[in-house]
Amino acid sequence: MFQSFFPKPKLFFISSAVWSLLAVLAWYAGGRDIGAYLGLPPLPPGQEPVIGVSVFWSTPFLWFYIYYAVVAGLFAAFWFAYSPHRWQYWSVLGTALIIFNTYFSVQVSVAINAWYGPFYDLIQQALARTAPVTAGQLYSGMIGFSGIAFVAVTVGVLNLFFVSHYIFRWRTAMNEFYVAHWPRLRHVEGASQRVQEDTMRFSSTVERLGVGLVSSIMTLIAFLPVLFKFSEQVNVLPIVGEIPHALVWAAVFWSVFGTVFLAAVGIKLPGLEFRNQRVEAAYRKELVYGEDHEDRADPITLAQLFDNVRRNYFRLYFHYMYFNIARIFYLQADNLFGTFVLVPAIVAGKLTLGVMNQVLNVFGQVRESFQYLVNSWTTIVELLSIYKRLKAFESVLVDEPLPEIDRQFIDAGGKEELAL
């Protein structure tokens, strides 16, 4: 799954995590100030960033682009020399580019949040008639937002195009790897589906979850300091009362609660998804045989195989029913949680409309980052089922025992109803 595309996968991912951590620490330990020697100084203390699209080519941003390129280039150069790999340009440099695009999308959110405050304060002044506000000022504010949105959409579309090629290259690498070992793999149940379909789904799902995880981490790095700052204004929570860093603790508590709650409710889903793929593969395989052999795909056999499909789907529907009830209830409550937390501050008159929108946006960004597992749980379930299927291939190639769920199927004589 990984060795076909990445050089020495285990060491590669560990080293990339360590290198990324060192790069972040070096940046905050003084790396961001080095740009001053190149004519790209950071913002002076106390000065607010530029509001609008021009922030993306301001001197602090330009220096970060150079810093990231150097860090990524050094990491790639090491791996190109240490463990050359056919797909190294896509797996190493391609991954670095996707991470950079993820960082850029987070900075778009930061830029939009900075735009919220002045614009909504302007609206409040116009509605309350506390200061003269012209239509031109409001139109100008909306044009500022449009500039940010245009850059975000352009970069986002280009990133999606690149990611599509990245995923297909990963699928190609897995396909070539498994086809090269096909004589040993062809006897594994549903081997054709595992090569043709599961490789495609695995690469796209891992990429989606990986980008989501990186985005969550970068969002926390970008927005947690802002949330700490706003916690100075919002230091009282409903029911709990006054506590330091109230907004941060509220976001952590609510996200951890949702993660544990939904993980417990959906614990049975990965195994059921795996079995669903197995019964579908068995039914499809018999139909394919029936296209070329008259003695295959007889009505009785097809009826038995379809009974397995129906039985597993009905079990899946039942378990997804209560999981979706729990998930939807939590997400609906989540829509109100930010406003619920701000009620004491709103009643006390501590917030303007602009600041309230900024706080809600920042709180939502941090909360969603902590809720990575909640928002990704159904995708994680899908990935686990795919991983279990491809893991059987890995086991055959390294002469390891098959995963338990495959052994149960073999021990049951290939009869799905006895393996459940």
Swiss-Prot record:
<dbReference type="InterPro" id="IPR036640">
    <property type="entry name" value="ABC1_TM_sf"/>
</dbReference>
<keyword id="KW-1133">Transmembrane helix</keyword>
<dbReference type="GO" id="GO:0015833">
    <property type="term" value="P:peptide transport"/>
</dbReference>
<feature type="transmembrane region" description="Helical">
    <location>
        <begin position="11"/>
        <end position="31"/>
    </location>
</feature>
<dbReference type="GO" id="GO:0005886">
    <property type="term" value="C:plasma membrane"/>
</dbReference>
<protein>
    <recommendedName>
        <fullName>Bacteroid development protein BacA</fullName>
    </recommendedName>
</protein>
<comment type="function">
    <text>Functions in the transport of molecules, possibly peptides, across the inner membrane. Is essential for bacteroid development.</text>
</comment>
<dbReference type="InterPro" id="IPR050835">
    <property type="entry name" value="ABC_transporter_sub-D"/>
</dbReference>
<feature type="transmembrane region" description="Helical">
    <location>
        <begin position="143"/>
        <end position="163"/>
    </location>
</feature>
<dbReference type="Pfam" id="PF05992">
    <property type="entry name" value="SbmA_BacA"/>
</dbReference>
<comment type="similarity">
    <text>Belongs to the peptide uptake permease (PUP) (TC 9.A.18) family.</text>
</comment>
<keyword id="KW-1003">Cell membrane</keyword>
<feature type="transmembrane region" description="Helical">
    <location>
        <begin position="247"/>
        <end position="267"/>
    </location>
</feature>
<keyword id="KW-0472">Membrane</keyword>
<feature type="transmembrane region" description="Helical">
    <location>
        <begin position="61"/>
        <end position="81"/>
    </location>
</feature>
<dbReference type="InterPro" id="IPR009248">
    <property type="entry name" value="SbmA_BacA"/>
</dbReference>
<feature type="transmembrane region" description="Helical">
    <location>
        <begin position="336"/>
        <end position="356"/>
    </location>
</feature>
<dbReference type="GO" id="GO:0005524">
    <property type="term" value="F:ATP binding"/>
</dbReference>
<dbReference type="GO" id="GO:1904680">
    <property type="term" value="F:peptide transmembrane transporter activity"/>
</dbReference>
<feature type="transmembrane region" description="Helical">
    <location>
        <begin position="92"/>
        <end position="112"/>
    </location>
</feature>
<keyword id="KW-0812">Transmembrane</keyword>
<keyword id="KW-0813">Transport</keyword>
<keyword id="KW-0614">Plasmid</keyword>
<feature type="transmembrane region" description="Helical">
    <location>
        <begin position="210"/>
        <end position="230"/>
    </location>
</feature>
<keyword id="KW-0997">Cell inner membrane</keyword>
